[in-house]
């Protein structure tokens, strides 16, 4: 009977304190059906509150657990060498007052940022000059340009961020989502390197 299995560690596992993570939770397994079921239910790690927020499970830990159970299994690994276990705790209910306060702070801050930018580049003078070029008349309040410009500014931000509140305009990720994705990749790489004690060896500890 073929006793070879293929394992690919998942990138991220979400768990709660007290959860027991099995090999099937931490990795995708492919191989003979009975062997696959047996390994999927094999305990690998128990999450506790002392683990705080992040635990790194290394492929060596998985191989060690499998071979302790059955040394005759031929394990072939595919993909990454670590999986990140993110420990989630019960979230506190968000205060309505705090939510409104933060929302107002962000709203006023973003409004001031836009206003200061337009003041720095003298956007009002630009609109006055454009109005005079187009119509041949000077108007210190060129609302004919300022109103469409303001509407276009708002629509442009909606298109740029690809969202209207929670509704996505299309499947294409926004620049902000791409930047957040790249940041998350860098953060995961940092955590995998610094939280995994197996990657660090001090020769003076021998």
Swiss-Prot record:
The record's Gene Ontology biological-process terms are: sporulation resulting in formation of a cellular spore
UniProt membrane topology term: Multi-pass membrane protein
Transmembrane regions listed in the UniProt entry: 97-117, 141-161
Q: Which UniProt keywords apply?
A: Cell membrane, Membrane, Sporulation, Transmembrane, Transmembrane helix
- Per the UniProt entry, the disulfide pairs are none
* Localization, UniProt: Cell membrane
Q: Which GO terms describe its cellular component?
A: plasma membrane
Q: What is this protein called?
A: Stage V sporulation protein AA
């Amino acid at each position: 009977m073929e006793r070879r299995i293929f394992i690919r560690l998942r990138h991220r596992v979400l768990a709660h304190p007290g959860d027991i993570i099995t090999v099937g939770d931490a990795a995708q397994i492919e191989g003979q059906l009975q062997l696959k079921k047996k390994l999927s239910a094999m305990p690998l790690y128990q999450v506790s509150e002392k683990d705080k927020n992040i635990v790194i499970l290394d492929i060596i830990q998985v191989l060690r657990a499998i071979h302790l159970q059955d040394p005759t299994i031929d394990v072939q690994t595919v993909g990454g060498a670590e999986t990140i276990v993110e420990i989630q705790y019960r979230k506190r209910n968000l205060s309505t007052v705090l939510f409104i306060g933060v929302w107002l702070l962000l709203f006023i801050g973003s409004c001031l940022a836009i206003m200061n930018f337009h003041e720095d580049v003298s956007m009002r003078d630009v609109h006055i000059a454009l109005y005079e070029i187009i119509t041949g008349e000077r108007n210190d309040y060129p609302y004919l340009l300022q109103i469409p410009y303001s509407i276009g500014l708002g629509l442009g931000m909606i298109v740029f961020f690809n969202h209207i509140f929670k509704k996505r305009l299309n499947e294409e990720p926004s620049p902000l989502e791409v930047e957040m994705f790249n940041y998350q990749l860098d953060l995961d790489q940092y955590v995998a390197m610094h939280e995994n004690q197996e990657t660090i060896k001090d020769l003076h500890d021998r």
